[in-house]
Amino acid sequence: MSYQEQQCKQLCQPLPVCPPPKPCSPPKCPEPCPPPKCPETCPPQPCQRKCPPVLEAPCQQKCPSKSK
């Protein structure tokens, strides 16, 4: 992994992309889907790490198109 990739990972991973579990489990996901705040140079994978599958399922109904 290059130095730049590591930098990107550090930038991307701590981003709070996923809403906290509690508001996420009922169909109370935040209406506006949080935009991917990662710089364009970041690899898509670390940036797109969202909720664990269990949480992501209910949340995805509110945020339909997250991958482009």
Swiss-Prot record:
It holds the Pfam family SPRR2. One of its GO terms (cellular component) is cornified envelope. Keywords: Cytoplasm, Keratinization, Repeat. It is found in: Cytoplasm. Sequence repeats lie at residues 21-26, 27-35, 36-44, 45-53. GO terms for biological process: epidermis development; keratinization; keratinocyte differentiation. Its main location: cytoplasm. The keyword Metal-binding does not apply. Residues 21-65 are annotated as: 3.5 X 9 AA approximate tandem repeats. Not expressed in uterus. Cross-linked envelope protein of keratinocytes. It is a keratinocyte protein that first appears in the cell cytosol, but ultimately becomes cross-linked to membrane proteins by transglutaminase. All that results in the formation of an insoluble envelope beneath the plasma membrane. Belongs to the cornifin (SPRR) family. This is Small proline-rich protein 2K. The lineage of its organism: Eukaryota, Metazoa, Chordata, Craniata, Vertebrata.
